[in-house]
């Protein structure tokens, strides 16, 4: 953004007085890094710290942001405010130093709320689908020439980044319920895609507490705001009488205000109709597979319709939607000959889904789009607590693939829980389905173990939220040894 554009932006969005230097602890997280990038482009001095370099820190470094790859009290020197990720413990030396120096320490969502204060905020929340829905809303607004600012939890492929500073009054953000911090946000429009039991440690294991927090989030809307809610979700349906705001519902249900009909899927493309109240029916061609993505698109259309975006821009944006990183992400179609000497090809898909509902949606999209392919899944459970809380659901959904290779649980900083392990999960799947999952205790052995299982026309699904994304890239770039016959861009043009 040039100085003229920034000056124009300042007429709508005043700068934060007395704030010149903002320090982020845990800056390598997608949400943290996105906010840091937007603030850097607004002209603030940004520094940050994290324990390891990643794609986010590399991108921020290219913007000239100073990043320390260690935590030390000197890192916060001269900061006006310190922003912390919920993953950072209270005894972090930088937090302690900030308190001693009387430097304000705030949560990520508090800074996101500050970005939203003088903007037209659109917040997308829900247990599943919020990253993709955020990307769809941002894509539609960009297609319409509205130049929004966005902050997303995943890479928006068309933009090549998680976040971007726009010149308009619109701010589109992913609202994270994992630590309940989304309650700080005060948008004008809010989407809730669904509500399921997840991150229950945050909510003291009380599902009613989780539901009430979502209601409180929606009641942050002004009386003239609007809640966009998926009526297919039974929890949301039961909560409707408790939500005292203007509501637009969407879904496959007959009583939805924006109703999906005639859904079909052909490989990576979804086709369906959207019936809207007092509006023309939209014939959608969506460049993303699965009924779950049709729901995400319906939510995005509801927001765009509310704002008066022309149908032409909506249709174009969804037709050319390039998706988000690690969401049914096709890394290529590879020949088998260099892998195990067999003839034919295999398709490699990388997917972030780590909750049973998300895994089931991925499997269903694969089965519908490619009914003749065997599904070979490499799965990495994420967190001991989630594996424990949703154990039976994991057993059920992981029994639905043809071949399963199971990695060890990615702890995400949690301590092990007795009797909760990938080995136990494999045993339970074996007892439940009589399938024979393969436990992989060493990532370096995965390529050879996988090669023994592969046959012509297989689809390999690399599934999970830990460090398994690196496994997928390694398989694509190194272990398969040859470039794919079809690059991923061919599916997301």
UniProtKB/Swiss-Prot annotation:
GO terms assigned for molecular function: ATP binding; UDP-N-acetylmuramate-L-alanine ligase activity
Any one GO BP annotation for this protein: peptidoglycan biosynthetic process
Catalytic reactions on record: UDP-N-acetyl-alpha-D-muramate + L-alanine + ATP = UDP-N-acetyl-alpha-D-muramoyl-L-alanine + ADP + phosphate + H(+)
Binding positions (ATP): 126-132
Compartments where located: Cytoplasm
Family per similarity comment: Belongs to the MurCDEF family.
Protein name from the UniProt record: UDP-N-acetylmuramate--L-alanine ligase
Organism in which the protein naturally occurs: Hamiltonella defensa subsp. Acyrthosiphon pisum (strain 5AT)
Gene: murC
